[in-house]
């Protein structure tokens, strides 16, 4: 199990990313616009740097919903590999069965 503080930190990052999504997209559009003046682009870079670091989606980490485990995460299920295996062995995931050949 992950520490509660780590789970809370992830929740905070998701909230910040949602809050600043439009602002970041607007600034990035100005930065990548070749028709914008150099001064406008530079000002957009400076404004982007003033936003909170945790508002960047790349700082988010996928975590298991049950345990908070950051590694071995399977997006399709939202769980870590360990919890997916346990659920599959109990027959809780429809259509998923152990491979045998």
Swiss-Prot record:
Keywords: Ribonucleoprotein, Ribosomal protein
GO biological process, one term: translation
TM stretches of this protein: none
GO CC list: cytoplasm; cytosolic small ribosomal subunit; small ribosomal subunit
Function: Binds 16S rRNA, required for the assembly of 30S particles and may also be responsible for determining the conformation of the 16S rRNA at the A site.
Similarity section: Belongs to the universal ribosomal protein uS14 family.
Quaternary organization: Part of the 30S ribosomal subunit. Contacts proteins S3 and S10.
NCBIfam families, alphabetized: PRK08881.1
Name the UniProt record assigns to this protein: Small ribosomal subunit protein uS14
Organism, as annotated: Escherichia coli (strain K12)
